[in-house]
Amino acid sequence: MAPVKVVLLDIEGTVCPISFVKDVLFPYALEALPGTLKAKWDSPGFASYRAAFPAEHAGSQETLAAHVRDLMSKDLKISYLKSLQGYLWETGYRNGELKAPLFADVAPQLARWREHNGAKVMIYSSGSVPAQKLLFGHTNGEPSDILPWLSDFFDTVNAGPKQEKASYEKIAAKHQEYPIGEWLFLSDNVKEVEAAKQAGMQSYIVDRPGNAELSEEARKEHRVVKSFEEIGDL
């Protein structure tokens, strides 16, 4: 197996619990939505978020809010929704109401890979790049802000859907100094891991508390780790 030069990380269920997104971030966004729409509806800074929504849902605060609630109830990963969620979370992160609860092994292992192995660490999540940066800039660890440790960020807008091989090829093509076989993608999602492997990356399934149960087939087909510590040095 080729040495790993780039570690590409999923977020939800990989570096932090799925429950943080489902039980903390999503409810926070829904609670903040009406007041934000009322305060920012006509402000220039909000215009791009509003304009990204389909016209039939962007005509009034009520129709936009109803559409957001509908999309979130179905957990649909649509880019304009993800962008708005990041906007809503920004206040919570900045005022200290929101802090990302990274699993205890994450920050020490990222530091180890960077400092001892010389690897680059990058992020690929269905959450928007601005939302990713908010999360890693406001963690429960010490230091709280680990953005300086991360070299690049990818989402469904700048890379594509996470279950498609072409998305991983596109990500690797942006950093051609690292052959695709020297990338390691870590995710809790079996289909994402399969897509990354099809593209030529190394990839492991991360099995964290609260994640979906893995099938026996998935466990036989892929390497499964419960902690980044199990990966050790690259």
Swiss-Prot record:
Substrate binds at S125, S126, K162. Binds 1 Mg(2+) ion per subunit. Mg(2+) binds at D10, E12, D188. Pathway: Amino-acid biosynthesis; L-methionine biosynthesis via salvage pathway; L-methionine from S-methyl-5-thio-alpha-D-ribose 1-phosphate: step 3/6; Amino-acid biosynthesis; L-methionine biosynthesis via salvage pathway; L-methionine from S-methyl-5-thio-alpha-D-ribose 1-phosphate: step 4/6. One of its GO terms (cellular component) is cytoplasm. InterPro entries: Enolase-ppase_E1, ENOPH1_eukaryotes, HAD-like_sf, HAD-SF_hydro_IA, HAD_sf. It catalyses: 5-methylsulfanyl-2,3-dioxopentyl phosphate + H2O = 1,2-dihydroxy-5-(methylsulfanyl)pent-1-en-3-one + phosphate. Its cofactor is Mg(2+). PANTHER family: ENOLASE-PHOSPHATASE E1. Monomer. Belongs to the HAD-like hydrolase superfamily. MasA/MtnC family. This is Enolase-phosphatase E1. It comes from Sordaria macrospora (strain ATCC MYA-333 / DSM 997 / K(L3346) / K-hell). The gene is UTR4.
